[in-house]
Amino acid sequence: MSYTKYQRGYFMPPTPSLEWSKKEYIAKAPIWCSVDLRDGNQALITPMSLEEKITFFKLLLKVGFKEIEVGFPAASETEYRFLRTLIEEDLIPDDVSVQVLTQAREHIIKKTFESLEGCKNAIVHVYNSTSYAQREQVFRKSKDEIKHIACEGAICLKESAAATKGNFRFEYSPESFSGTEVDYALEVCNAVIDIFEPTLEKKLIINLPVTVEMSLPHIYASQVEYMSKHLKNRENVLISLHPHNDRGCAIADAELGLLAGADRIEGTLFGNGERTGNVDIITLAMNMHSHGVDPKLDFSNIPSICDVYEKVTKMQVYERQPYSGKLVFAAFSGSHQDAIAKGMAYHKEHNLSTWSVPYLPIDPKDVGRVYESDVIRINSQSGKGGIAYILHHHYGVNLPPLFREEFSYYVKNISDKAHKELSPDEICEIFQNDFVNLNNTLCVQDFHFTHIDSKPSQEFNVKLHILYAKENSKTQQEITGKGNGRLDSIANALREHLNLDFEIIDYSEHSLKKGSTSQAVSYVQIESKGKKCFGVGIDNDIITASIYGLVSALNRII
């Protein structure tokens, strides 16, 4: 790669101050404008049909957008027809403004206003390119000639609006602002402001697009701050930002630009747009949400938004897309899973009102995600905490600490051999099939206890019928034993009559559900010849569950 042919294509403001950098965070939501139906649509391999655009428009309304760019009606019959459909079928709410794009050319501007006939509220966005490269290479015009194009466009826009019924607001963009000398961009914008004569009731939007991203975000913020300080009639002007993502910094451009004085953001859902895309409004809004600032947009059901978006655009939301992707809250790492599980348990235990869970910047439920399926995910990298969390939430079992470790290794080994993630259902199936109520080699068919003494005590005799498979044959036997407690008497009987050498080294139990009809689950760990393993028993009766747990452990070790 030859880096020497490149040079920095941006321009620093004449007097950068960096006052914006003293601000800690964005304290209030900007005005949001979705450009999905124009900027986003023109970047699709297969542009949306009329019906798909209407579906998307309704989605944007549901999210809460009050300004929606709907197209370039003078340049495309499809976009003209879409705008007319919105107007004629009364699909635009009274509190929503549609935005249309036009070049600073008289015949295009007049056609644009024809398309707006009957529209209650509209923003007409006029632009012309002002960058050094475009002036020199594309238009081959001087600075004064480029400024004249902007001024003529503004005059034509103002006159056309006066001759057309409707409530129109105006927007001007020095396109390719990111490659324009900042003092020259200011000169052009101020000339346009003089023509439009904005008022407090009808403010002018000055849009400063990062048409192609060229600089670090703090440079763009300094450019925005300079414009904000030096624009004429600033109190009646809204500064809008339109960042693209060529250097991967569109979010940072927008956030620092807002700190620097911007009032408005143009962007798209999931950052769809030309080349590397526009700024992702969902990420911007949810970043504010995570700081306790109301973004004034509703992204409480991201999965549903993803479904509509993918259906109408034929695009896919990247699995790691901030806040939106299917894997953004997923924890496969064992240490992460353990920290998340403990953090969520701590929140529940202490009834905390503010969110602060390790590895989760926001509560996944805020965007319609589910802890059990979207947060704790199990593969060969997972740990005991995450696997135990899955079993607890999906199956109601609380694995004892020693069993968590054994079961996690067992599950991870299966995932590793299969080279895949395991679903909660698959984990529960492993637990049920390989640990619970096992009777493949040894089966206790029935049992009967009696106290050794006539008076009640903890010493019991037991008589039990077993089915024991050994050397390809099964034998049914009646055996007896005694011990200090029911489980001990069963263990002694099995040791003596089956020549099994083992010790019970850990035991715990709990109810699967609350109430008298709940099942009991027992965990029994045994050790035999230096090998340790757990078995699990589940039954309506706690004694039976404990016996099944012991037998399950024996079946796993013999």
UniProtKB/Swiss-Prot annotation:
GO terms for biological process: L-leucine biosynthetic process. Residues 30-303 form the Pyruvate carboxyltransferase domain. Keywords: Amino-acid biosynthesis, Branched-chain amino acid biosynthesis, Cytoplasm, Leucine biosynthesis, Magnesium, Metal-binding, Transferase. InterPro entries: 2-isopropylmalate_synth_dimer, AIPM/Hcit_synth_CS, Aldolase_TIM, IPM_Synthase, LeuA-like_post-cat, LeuA_allosteric_dom_sf, LeuA_N_DRE-TIM, PYR_CT. It is found in: Cytoplasm. Its cofactor is Mg(2+). It holds the Pfam family IPMS_D2. Gene3D superfamilies: 3.30.160.270, Aldolase class I. GO terms for cellular component: cytoplasm. PROSITE patterns: AIPM_HOMOCIT_SYNTH_1, AIPM_HOMOCIT_SYNTH_2, PYR_CT. Coiled coil: none annotated. Its EC number is 2.3.3.13. It catalyses: 3-methyl-2-oxobutanoate + acetyl-CoA + H2O = (2S)-2-isopropylmalate + CoA + H(+). Residues 438-558 are annotated as: Regulatory domain. Its main location: cytoplasm. Mg(2+) binds at residues 39, 242, 244, 278. Pathway: Amino-acid biosynthesis; L-leucine biosynthesis; L-leucine from 3-methyl-2-oxobutanoate: step 1/4. GO terms for molecular function: 2-isopropylmalate synthase activity; acetyl-CoA C-acetyltransferase activity; magnesium ion binding. The keyword Transferase applies. Belongs to the alpha-IPM synthase/homocitrate synthase family. LeuA type 2 subfamily. Catalyzes the condensation of the acetyl group of acetyl-CoA with 3-methyl-2-oxobutanoate (2-ketoisovalerate) to form 3-carboxy-3-hydroxy-4-methylpentanoate (2-isopropylmalate). This is 2-isopropylmalate synthase. It comes from Helicobacter hepaticus (strain ATCC 51449 / 3B1).
